[in-house]
Amino acid sequence: MVKLESPAYGFQGTARARAQAARWLLIGLVPAFLVCCAKTQSKPTIPAGNARFEFLTPSLVRMEYSPAGVFVDAPTAVVQKRDWPAVQVQSTQKEGWLIAATSAITLRYRLRSGPFTAANLSVTWNDPAGAAHAWHPGDVDPLNLGGLTYSLDNISKPNLPEGQMDLESPVNDMIPGIDVLLAKAKPGLLSRGGYAFIDDSQTPVWNAHRTWIEPRPQQNGQDWYLFTYNRDYQKVLKQYAELCGPIPMIPRYVLGPWITDFNFEYFPDTVESGQPAFKRYNQRYLQDEVSRLRQNLIPFDTLVLDLAWHNYGWQGGYDWSPLIAHPDELLSWLHSQGVKLSLNDHPGYANTEESILSFNDSHAPQVLKDLGRPLPPKPSFDLDISKLWSFSTDPHDQGLSHHWYATDHAEGRWKPIRIGLPWQDQGYRTYQGVGWYRASVRLPAKLPEALYVYLGEVNKTYRIFVNGKEATHSRIHWPRRLTYTDIAPYVKAGQQNEIVLRVEPGENHGGILRGPVAIRDVAPPPRIYFDLSNREQAEVFMRDLHEPLMRQGVDLWWVDGGSGAVDMPGLNKQLWTNKVFYDYTQQETGRRGFILGRYGDWGSERYPAFFTGDAYSQWPVLAYEVAFSARGGNVLVPYISHDIGGFHGAKIDFDLYARWIEFGTFSPLLRMHSAHANPREGNMRMPWVYGSQGIALMRKYFTLHTQLIPYLYTYTWLAHKESMPILRPLYLQYPELEEAYQHSHEYFFGEELLVAPVLDPSGNRTIYLPPGQWIDFFTGRRYQGGTTFTAHYAVEETPVFVREGAIIPEQSASEYSNAKPLDTLILNVYGSGKGSFDLYEDDGDSLAYTEGQYARTAMTYASSSDGFHNLIIEPTRGTFQGQGQARSYELRIHAADKPSSISVNGREVGGWMWDAGQAAAVVVLPRQSIRDRMSVTWR
């Protein structure tokens, strides 16, 4: 259960949250001091000098080596469980070897031989056919089916060359030539070799006294886990979840569609921020966008604000930008529309020294006080020079050789220029050569001893000259990139001073992009940084910067990076950043946690979900994402969120836009996003960009995704309880079927639906269907399984197939996922055969499910050889807050012959409808108590 995660972190939340955290602490930190020496023993730990072996299950073994003989019994940042049931182990010593065997594996270690190597350690086992298998330290598994990587940032066809695959990753998993990012990914848990290996040697351990993590007492030990399972893939996923922590339940509303906007930066007091486009693209624009989606009957649940909600840019502020003039009103209005709000955050982005907090942010004084750091000195001399500049192009790059930086220069065609905009936006749109800036500044007769020129953000490569001499310059990250230079040695008091800047542009933006542009007597203060592996700093970070926004009404956080905000040896920085955000928000609110974060390797399943990053809008990228999502199940990451439509790409072709939405519809998380959601372009992922065709397509698929939430939410429970991913590769369902390993661009969505998204502009799709009978989800057409076929799908169609006999529950169409109580449930049954579904429900938001407050409703469907079909809805089991006590059902019978009669609980009913084109019957069943059994029969 989630309680095994344990750390309360010392964060202060609600009384209920603190009590819950205390329970986690008590339950999750029971050490397992188990030492056994008998030849046959039920205690699973076997000491062997400086080595120790612990058999957690008959097929899962922990192997530790410590040069100092100091072993770890506390949980770590990755491994949560230490108290395991007894395992029968037979151990002997023979000719200097320790031999320990369970019913599943045999371990051999040469005693007193030092750290584990291929020469002194092995684990062997047999598969069901009796074939022997062996593992040794250092083995490379070419049969591993692959894991995930930190992100898919900037993935595109050109930057994915062939021939750079890691041997530890599958070579036949993707479209040839675009799978290089797998080389950065570690192997997953699933392998046709029948084993998985986790190295936990370096990760920090939990200190129960300090209630926080700390580095391992020694960094040169070995702490390994080996899972053996043959082809029982579900077994290894369940054991991994037991070891490293289960997938928690997520808020139900996050399964509804998401819209992202505001992908641009806001810096106050710049020329750009004062442009009319910025004044239009604001709070009112967002409300109009939401209203327009509602007016077009396009359901969605969550609005995400990207960079521009921050004042001082995406790496510098937690104040609202002036574009959100009345955030309380916006939050209240969004919540009245059934819309949740998520904000983007970049804590310690990209492992650089870029600022986490600007000194200009209103939170800075309190943060510095709480961190015990001094306030920076304020300048006593502050001369604004932003309006003194002229500019000249240098297309032949002759300015240096002709001494344009000299005070007596005569060349160049100098014209006035504004600071705060690239020169491309000031009449030099196509110019990409060297540019020169010049300002003549008269300084007073009396100057302070220290003097610095601030030149804001200069893009990109530059040199600074003062009175004809080149000055040594600095660049600090505050709040993004601030150029400043000590000019005291070069200036002349009481005279005109020439400041010259030579700039080589970067990409499409060159020059002084934003301020401050001034001369001051103090250097810029260093960044305000946080180390989230430090308990006190983590608490200040969340309490001072995030808690006020959460209390204002912000619902969840998009943790867009975090690899630079943590500093502890052996700790995965992204994993810990995700944990800090997830646990703090859960403890502060007393409700379920949820974040959009990057992937943090082992243990990431505990902190859903995984945002994959800024990919390009290309067909091969869409194909990559399909197989990548399916592979997420290999490391037990069920909630993967791609930028639907791709990030880098403005108005993409409609067929690519449509196919991406179709893929997103049959994914747990459906989130539209683009780099092109800004004042100049508008939001290029909105459906009206494509006119009525785009609106109709988004309405169709967003509505379908929302209606499927009862089905999908049941699988979130199974992900939590049974450790099974929602989006599953074919081989997870059919591990012994060779064809299941050859179709990585198909996947199961739950157990009943098979999805094969269209991946190229032709609309053609070659599809493999596993054995059995299958039915087209949209048309009702039947297919024989165990075959491969090719079909064409129009742009508004997508290949989805239902296993015959399946029961697929849906809810009624609505503006957002929880707009209506689930007092009417649509039940879709398909064809003949047998099937079952055990519907899961709870309050959708609280942690009460951990205390057993939820409900299940079992449904079974069966067909007989004499043409009778029977659906049984059993009485609902269990209760939860807000549970409805009565329900009606709308039964939809697909891929069937027209019934001659339909009866409910033995009484024939009329009024049902028959759709000959769809070969489907629809009957509305009478409303009754959820505690009553219902039987529906037709023939």
Which residues does each predicted region cover?
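Catalytic core of carbohydrate-active enzymes
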Residues: G603-F610, E625, G632-H642, G649-F868, ...
